[in-house]
Amino acid sequence: MITNTAAYQFVTIQHPQTLAASVLAQAEQQALKGSVLIAEEGINLFLAGDAEQIGAFYAWLQADARFARMRIKYSESAYQPFARLKVKIKPEIISFRRDDASPLQGRAPSVTPAVLREWLRNGQDDRGRPLVLLDTRNAQEVVYGTFQGALTLPIDTFTELPGALESHRAALADATVVSFCTGGIRCEKAALWMQADGMDNVLQLEGGILGYFEEVGGEGYDGRCFVFDERVALDPELKPLVDAERPAKTGKI
């Protein structure tokens, strides 16, 4: 079996090139595949490989105090969903292009999967306020599944979210808004931006959809969660939609 991981950490990285070289060397040593994005604002990882080698890599990474509290989300597949290993340096570990949404300057309040499940059952939060679940993902992801009744936006990139949300602001004013995404990274920035833009009723779902699946299952969720690899999407039991051996490349005759 292949162990698949998703993890990120917003933390100041003073020398991204140095960290990238070390991460690449360690991941290659453990024969891992996937993608790692590194920026001055942190690190974002999607890695897959043998369970023991995955464990060794993250033990090495979390020995660094900057990443000691990183939350790692796990799932399994029969086959490797990545073709190669890529480690890249980027301006942001998730592109949003908003200076007022830097998790390095603070973090928006969050709600745990268990609490959100209770709110969904009750149709309101603990204070009796109505709920609006805001899907911060792209339209191509949403078609595979989302929370029941979620507000979805017709966007192709995360940077389009502020403009697409503008027409919904009045409807959100009297509700508790819970922003969510695949693993937490986008909803973390989205919630911060919404707060900075004057919305004080916004929370982020801790761990995103995958964290929700992992902790409480699929209650209140319709369908699967899209992922950016050859598994395509995961169901609430974290089982892949596609789990097949990668076809061998063949040359032209």
Swiss-Prot record:
One GO term under biological process is: tRNA modification
| UniProt-listed Enzyme Commission number(s) | 1.14.-.-
Catalysis performed (reactions): uridine(34) in tRNA + AH2 + O2 = 5-hydroxyuridine(34) in tRNA + A + H2O
Query: Which Pfam families does the annotation name?
Result: Rhodanese (PF00581), UPF0176_N (PF17773)
| Active site (UniProt) | 181
User: Main EC class of this protein?
Assistant: oxidoreductase
Instruction: Provide the Rhodanese domain boundaries.
Output: 127-221
Q: Give GO MF terms, alphabetically.
A: oxidoreductase activity, acting on paired donors, with incorporation or reduction of molecular oxygen
Q: Which residues cross the membrane?
A: none
Q: Specify the protein name.
A: tRNA uridine(34) hydroxylase
User: What species does this protein belong to?
Assistant: Xanthomonas oryzae pv. oryzae (strain PXO99A)
